[in-house]
């Protein structure tokens, strides 16, 4: 099975050490850990600083990586950091997902783990918006009838900046995501949509 993980710096594996930052090794990035522990082909499509796309390039994204069984998207943190509310971020996410829904794959929406006070997160209001984002995404997933992963209860450890995962955070995220994938696998198996030119199966 091929899973495309579309996200921001926490999907990419950004490590905020040094002046310009760095990247965790493959053994400490949740995407690579997911691949190692499941045996599935996991595509890391994370990018530092990425917000929810507002330009219609979703089809190009699909053709670049086709065929894809599951499109896992986890975005919204950078939107909040740039001043958007949780509701505004959810509206952007809905517009983005509506570009993808007619085209082939199963979408899995994940809420980013909540931020905490830190070097990048100066206010409690920002933390509250990051918690509220999961509530907005849950409602959106119900509206679009797609699986949803709520990471709020995973207690992901974050670095000093209040945004990025620590190594332990990446490992915990991978473990929890594997459990979540297993719990929704029946639904994925029975709702899997894939490009018509490619026959495939789920987990």
Regions found by a protein language model. Give the residues of each.
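Alpha-helical cap/lid subdomain in secreted, periplasmic
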Residues: 28-33, 37, 57-203
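Serine-esterase "nucleophile elbow" of acetyl-processing enzymes
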Residues: 1-47, 51, 59-67, 171-172
């Amino acid at each position: 099975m091929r899973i495309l993980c579309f996200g921001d710096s926490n999907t990419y594996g950004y490590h905020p050490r040094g002046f310009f930052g760095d990247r965790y090794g493959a053994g400490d990035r949740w995407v690579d850990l997911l691949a190692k522990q499941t045996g599935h082909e996991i595509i890391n499509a994370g990018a530092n600083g990425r917000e929810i796309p507002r330009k219609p390039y979703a089809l190009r994204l699909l053709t670049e990586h086709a065929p894809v069984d599951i499109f896992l998207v986890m975005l919204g943190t950078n939107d909040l950091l740039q001043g958007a509310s949780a509701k505004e971020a959810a509206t952007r996410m809905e517009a983005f997902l509506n570009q993808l829904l007619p085209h082939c794959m199963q979408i899995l929406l994940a809420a980013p783990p909540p931020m905490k006070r830190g070097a990048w997160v100066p206010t409690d209001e920002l933390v509250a918006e990051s918690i509220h984002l999961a509530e907005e995404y849950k409602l959106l997933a119900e509206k679009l009838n797609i699986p949803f992963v709520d990471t709020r209860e995973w207690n992901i450890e974050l670095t000093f900046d209040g945004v990025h995962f620590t190594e332990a955070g990446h490992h915990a995220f991978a473990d929890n995501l594997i459990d979540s994938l297993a719990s929704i696998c029946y639904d994925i198996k029975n709702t899997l949509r894939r490009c018509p030119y490619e026959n495939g199966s789920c987990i």
